[in-house]
Amino acid sequence: MRVSNMFFQTLREVPAEAEIASHQLMLRAGLMRKLASGIYSFLPLGYRVFRKIEQIVREEMDRAGAQELIMSALLPAESYQASGRWEVFGAEMFRLKDRNGRDFCLGPTHEEIFTETVKSVTRSYRSLPLILYQIQTKYRDERRPRFGVMRSREFVMKDAYSFDRDEAGLDISYKKMYDAYCRIFDRLGLDYIIVDADTGAMGGSDSQEFMVKSAVGESRIAYCEACGYAANDEKAECVPEKCCDDKECCGELGLEKVATPDVRTIEELMQFFGCSAKEFAKTLIYKADDKVVAAMVRGDRELNETKLQNLLGCIELEMADAETVEKVTGAAVGFAGPIGLDIDIVVDLEVAEMKNFVVGANETGFHYKNVNINRDFKPKYVKDIRTIKEGDACPKCGAPVKVEFGIEVGHIFKLGTKYSEALDCIYLDETGKERPMIMGCYGIGINRSMAAVIEQNNDENGIIWPISIAPYHVIVIPVNTTDSVQMELAEKIYTQLGEMGIEVLLDDRDERPGVKFKDADLIGIPIRITVGKRAGEGIVEYKLRREKDFAAIPYEEAIAKAKKEVAEGLKK
């Protein structure tokens, strides 16, 4: 491709709305264009990368024995109503009615549709196991789209679904997809970690995420270097710190009510009482669907809303507003406590280990000290509802865990019979008995994977694409397009590389060399061959994007090196 014929435009300035490297570079390099909040169009250069990621995914899915199809993105409400997820998705689902008033949605995910399709075709155990997949656009009305295609309202996913006779069969299908995902992300050149995860609205039992460590990731990963345990913070188990073993120290003291005027926050309480945050228990008031509940964690801990939501089984969970807090507790925000509270109370495991702690008194300007669980109040649930943090004990081996941010690029689930039972997707076993199919679900975000690659492969000059998904492998840059000797050699190199099957650009624009070099670096072409003043000698400059130095070598050697580099890059 000649650059003079390409439909693209690079930007020198960083767009104001772009906060992270991948978003900035995808806009600056002319890979995509914003249409609206969370909605983007891919331009030719970006779409070439996009298609290559799709192709790698497709090749590995086919290699694992999965069969590709394509489902509609416009889906009838009845399918989601049958599984109960029409309500579960809440405001995140794009809903619409046709001219006859029938409810539809733009598909946020396709479990129900795949299940119904298999149900209509497959009836015998002889047809199982079965793995189907599609690469299709999804729609979710994100509350706050951000970071470009990292969290958008329209995105492309590869979603696959396995159907098996039993749990043993599901284990085999799950392992096939697990291995396929490892090969996919290896070929994309990603440095990733596999973590245990929450199943969320998808339902089911076991779940794992493929995470790319990144400071701009929206997920937090807890992992143990000692034993290999890894989970996202929604799933990571928290080991409660025990109260001290000194029975005299931990004996129950008498409950005291203390005046604490204008003392609301943990920091203010620490100063007032002269003790650490570990001696306080926060009482947080939440709205869980149509109920109000209280949740308690230690003063130095953060509540994990996903764990709380899963425990309560609610669709919507949000912090109560000040009016609700005052109505339920009889006090202003900052003075809520469990004693005398006439709502369900959920206590974190760590709070259950505490003795003689401080809580709000449900009276503005007052707190209780020497509070003890069961004596002074009785919780409905005692469960792990806090968020793990750096240095906490690993739930498997007890060593300190590390916590980092990550980008989720893939997610695999064991769904079991959640959808097959709800949608009556059954098969006849060897004895003629009806049994529900055992399902698995496997997703990869194509857009997000593209952004994740950029997050891990960039520098101050632009993107550094792995050869496997680069829009073009090589760019040939003649320094002076009016010099016939330079242009003749550049054309020769361009032609020979193209005949070898190498994807090559020829920057034949009448631009300054500096502009061409900056564009090549910004776009991230892996190999640059510059044809300059020594063209008459057959000498060119050969440079890899990931390296700073270049080599002045004969053009034949440059062609051979490019061929070898591309072959090795595509082999990985």
From Swiss-Prot:
GO terms for biological process: prolyl-tRNA aminoacylation. Its EC number is 6.1.1.15. The keyword Nucleotide-binding applies. It catalyses: tRNA(Pro) + L-proline + ATP = L-prolyl-tRNA(Pro) + AMP + diphosphate. PROSITE patterns: AA_TRNA_LIGASE_II (PS50862). SUPFAM superfamilies: Class II aaRS ABD-related (SSF52954), Class II aaRS and biotin synthetases (SSF55681), YbaK/ProRS associated domain (SSF55826). GO terms for cellular component: cytosol. The keyword Protein biosynthesis applies. It is an enzyme of class 6 (ligase). One of its GO terms (molecular function) is ATP binding. Keywords: Aminoacyl-tRNA synthetase, ATP-binding, Cytoplasm, Ligase, Nucleotide-binding, Protein biosynthesis. InterPro entries: aa-tRNA-synt_IIb, aa-tRNA-synth_II, aa-tRNA-synth_II/BPL/LPL, Anticodon-bd, Anticodon-bd_dom_sf, Pro-tRNA-ligase_IIa, Pro-tRNA-synth_IIa_bac-type, Pro-tRNA-Synthase_IIa_type1. Gene3D superfamilies: Anticodon-binding domain, Bira Bifunctional Protein, Domain 2, YbaK/aminoacyl-tRNA synthetase-associated domain. Consists of three domains: the N-terminal catalytic domain, the editing domain and the C-terminal anticodon-binding domain. Catalyzes the attachment of proline to tRNA(Pro) in a two-step reaction: proline is first activated by ATP to form Pro-AMP and then transferred to the acceptor end of tRNA(Pro). As ProRS can inadvertently accommodate and process non-cognate amino acids such as alanine and cysteine, to avoid such errors it has two additional distinct editing activities against alanine. One activity is designated as 'pretransfer' editing and involves the tRNA(Pro)-independent hydrolysis of activated Ala-AMP. Homodimer. Belongs to the class-II aminoacyl-tRNA synthetase family. ProS type 1 subfamily. This is Proline--tRNA ligase. It comes from Acetivibrio thermocellus (strain ATCC 27405 / DSM 1237 / JCM 9322 / NBRC 103400 / NCIMB 10682 / NRRL B-4536 / VPI 7372). The gene is proS.
